[in-house]
Amino acid sequence: MAVPKRRKSKSKVRTKRAHHAIGKPNLVPCPNCNSYRLPHRICPTCGFYKTGIVLEPKVKKPKEEN
């Protein structure tokens, strides 16, 4: 089985990992309510997708006090 001949230094390892960062999400405005959403997905605030409302948006219920 192949084994590395020399140990890799911290700087060599970190230089290699410099490109492993997670990129920013590409957000687009919703054509219905102008809030930002991910492309090709239902808008989480209004439930709109392409031609009309596909899903009813979740409404937060007020907490009842005891």
UniProtKB/Swiss-Prot annotation:
GO cellular component: cytosolic large ribosomal subunit
Alphabetical GO biological process terms: translation
Entry's transmembrane regions: none
GO MF annotation, one: structural constituent of ribosome
Pfam families in the record: Ribosomal_L32p (PF01783)
Keywords in alphabetical order: Ribonucleoprotein, Ribosomal protein
UniProt family annotation: Belongs to the bacterial ribosomal protein bL32 family.
Name of the protein described by the UniProt record: Large ribosomal subunit protein bL32
Gene: rpmF
